[in-house]
Amino acid sequence: IKAIIRHLERLGVTLINGSHAIDTVKDKLYTQQILAESNLPVPKTLLLKHPINLDWVEKHLNFPVIIKTLSGSFGAGVFMAENKKQLKQLVKMAEITNEGYDIILQEFVKDSYGKDLRVLVINGKVAGCMMRQSTDDDFRANITRGGEGIPYQITEDIEWLGGEAA
């Protein structure tokens, strides 16, 4: 797909999401870095390399924590650990399934449990907003996981954040 998108760009076809945007969002840590460098609010994020020092993690993040693989979409590779024991189990699973893995840990944002906002920005201007909401008490709100999309009123904060993030 990447080759097709780049080819369309070379032909001058207007795309909503170009190759640069897609490359950026495919790497969750890189996306966090770009947002943080722009002084936009992001959850505290740690990149973990094998072997992981769980005591060190516990000192730097409060539980629960969100565990993410660096790439992935549709909520795949995203887990929540309520405590150190669960984190240890998830880390062991990552070690078994992907030797030399990289994962990120993020502080859990309580207000976002089971919901998030998707903001459509076109040419630097917010064109629409949707709340994704879990329908089964999952902390993830992905529509592909059964969540639903609900139209959401665009506020000044959403207008500003959407424009800055784009």
Describe the role of every protein-language-model region.
Residues I1-K26, P41-K44:
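A short, GP-enriched loop/loop-strand-helix hinge that lies immediately N-terminal to
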Residues I22-Q106, Y113-G114:
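Active-site nucleotide/adenylate-binding loops and adjacent lid/helix of ATP-dependent enzymes
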Residues M80-A165:
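Phosphate-binding site of ATP-dependent enzymes
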Residues I4, L54, G162:
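Aromatic/hydrophobic pocket-lining residues that form π-stacking "cages" and hydrophobic walls in ligand
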Residues H7, I34, V57, E164-A166:
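Residues within well-ordered alpha helices
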